[in-house]
């Protein structure tokens, strides 16, 4: 029986009540419809609980599909299995209790998500779920071991299960690994392929977000993954590398140096004066002269740029030809700054003075709100008289 208009307007606190922090009234209604249609069966209890979602085991029909994913019958490629039941994982994102409160910083600066609502948690979660599906499809297309998305509706995501019906793939943290060195190389390859093939940085890669099954490492939880041109992509990449190195070094594996992995994967070159320092996630690596703040760092950056182009430069060469190095590096990088730090400061002062002058002229010619209203009323009156 359909609800009347008056009943639809009634809202109660119980409508927002949740079970397991994710199963509210709307979510339960979607699950009940899927079960009534025979698309989702044998939904079991919570497999694990994370900061952003709960994961449940179940079984789904191979005919299950959604408009957003558009992959009907792609769960299995074997002919004659259309409409059969396969094991799946149901990931339900939390809506009422936002234990993962900094989702916005992973979505902002993403060209794929220019407009999103931050005041409505349900709309934000919907964007987050869509982001995870898009990232998973990128990984699937790049051949990176990961689950395949099957169905998406609001905050409910159905994916293929990693493992067998009776055996779910354990997290890397809980797995018994015989070949630790090979497993480490697989993890490094995942970071490299995500960056170079899929154009993504995981941003939360650790032993908790990797599964290990039959000697293969699978990557999961890519909702927070960002594109490589994201403002924080470099920071997240360093964090992922350090997390993997830290885990395997505790296991006794001889890991590669974080700086070397960062240079190999990202293609960025760490300056010579930072080579002996293990970069952290908050490290800033300048790529042009305009990003260098003071004169001392400018000379070091110039010497580093010169040595990369013409070979190594000694300290004596730097002291004798410091100003020339600055000038040469500026010319090679196409920078607008002139020789030395003093001229740079003068240039900044001149630009600041120009901006102040332009703002003063703009304020002088600004029309007040009262004058705008008077002009608008006169325009409306003239329009009415013409009609």
UniProtKB/Swiss-Prot annotation:
Region (Disordered): 309-372
UniProt KW GTP-binding keyword: no
Gene3D superfamilies listed in its UniProt record: Phosphorylase Kinase, domain 1, Transferase(Phosphotransferase) domain 1
GO terms assigned for molecular function: ATP binding; hydrolase activity; metal ion binding; protein serine kinase activity; protein serine/threonine kinase activity
Pfam families with a match to the protein in the record: RIO1
Biased composition (Basic residues): 361-372
Signal peptide: none
Keyword list, A-Z: ATP-binding, Cytoplasm, Hydrolase, Kinase, Magnesium, Metal-binding, Nucleotide-binding, Ribosome biogenesis, Serine/threonine-protein kinase, Transferase
Name assigned to this protein: Probable serine/threonine-protein kinase RIO1 homolog
Natural source organism: Encephalitozoon cuniculi (strain GB-M1) (Microsporidian parasite)
């Amino acid at each position: 029986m359909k609800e009347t208009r008056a009943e639809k307007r009634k809202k109660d606190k119980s409508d927002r009540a949740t079970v397991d922090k994710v199963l509210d009234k709307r979510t339960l209604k979607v699950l009940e419809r899927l079960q009534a249609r025979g698309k989702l069966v044998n939904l079991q209890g919570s497999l694990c609980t994370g900061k952003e979602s709960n994961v449940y085991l179940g079984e789904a029909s191979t005919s299950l599909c959604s408009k957003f994913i558009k992959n009907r019958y792609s769960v299995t490629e074997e002919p004659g299995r259309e409409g059969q039941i396969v094991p799946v994982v149901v990931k339900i994102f939390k809506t009422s209790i936002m234990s993962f409160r900094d989702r916005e910083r992973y979505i902002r600066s993403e060209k794929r998500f220019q407009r999103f609502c931050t005041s409505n948690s349900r709309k934000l979660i919907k964007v987050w779920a869509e982001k995870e599906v898009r990232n998973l499809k990128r990984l699937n297309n790049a051949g990176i071991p990961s689950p395949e998305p099957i169905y998406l509706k609001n905050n409910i995501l159905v994916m293929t299960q990693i493992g067998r019906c009776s055996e779910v793939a354990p997290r890397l943290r809980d797995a018994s690994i015989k070949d630790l060195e090979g497993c480490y190389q697989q993890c490094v390859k995942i970071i490299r392929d995500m960056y170079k093939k899929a154009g993504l940085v995981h941003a939360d890669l650790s032993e908790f977000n990797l599964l290990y099954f039959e000697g293969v490492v699978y990557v999961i939880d890519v909702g927070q993954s960002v594109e490589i041109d994201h403002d924080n992509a470099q920071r997240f990449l360093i964090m992922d590398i350090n997390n993997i190195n830290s885990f395997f070094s505790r296991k006794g594996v001889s890991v590669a140096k974080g700086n070397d992995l960062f240079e190999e994967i990202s293609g960025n070159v760490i300056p010579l004066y930072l080579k002996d320092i293990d970069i952290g996630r908050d490290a800033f690596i300048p790529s042009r002269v305009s990003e260098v703040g003071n004169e001392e760092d400018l000379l070091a950056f110039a010497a580093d740029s010169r040595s990369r182009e013409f070979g190594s430069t000694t300290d004596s060469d730097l002291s004798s030809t410091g100003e020339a190095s600055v000038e040469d590096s500026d010319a090679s990088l196409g920078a607008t700054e002139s020789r030395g730090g003093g001229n740079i400061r003068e240039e900044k002062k001149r630009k600041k003075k120009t901006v102040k002058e332009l703002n003063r002229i703009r304020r002088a010619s600004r029309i007040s709100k009262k004058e705008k209203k008077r002009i608008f009323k006169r325009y409306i009156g003239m329009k009415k008289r013409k009609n």
